[in-house]
Amino acid sequence: LNLIADCAVVVAIHGYSWEIQETMLGGLDEKLKHRMGRQMALAGLDVKLDNHPYPGLHENNICNRGQLEQGIQLELSDALRGGSDEPTVIQSTRSVLLKISQECTP
């Protein structure tokens, strides 16, 4: 927790066992979650925002332990990690985070 103590928003990345290339997004930051989901969907990725087993809504979830007490988590399937869509996930995530950091820079 010391690592994220000075972070306003935390983005946690986890993996789960599944043979389909997909991403499940969770966390309490609904705006960021939908923004990330929109970017991933535009890139052609299979992304789930709701009604999945990893919503990341508990206040003690690592993604919700930053200064703003809300963040997002990316749950990446086994098939996605190391699969053909992995670079697209990385690019989509970086794109959104870069835009956010530019919006926060005076």
Spans of model-derived segments:
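Catalytic cores of processing enzymes, dominated by hydrolases/peptidases
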Residues: 1-105
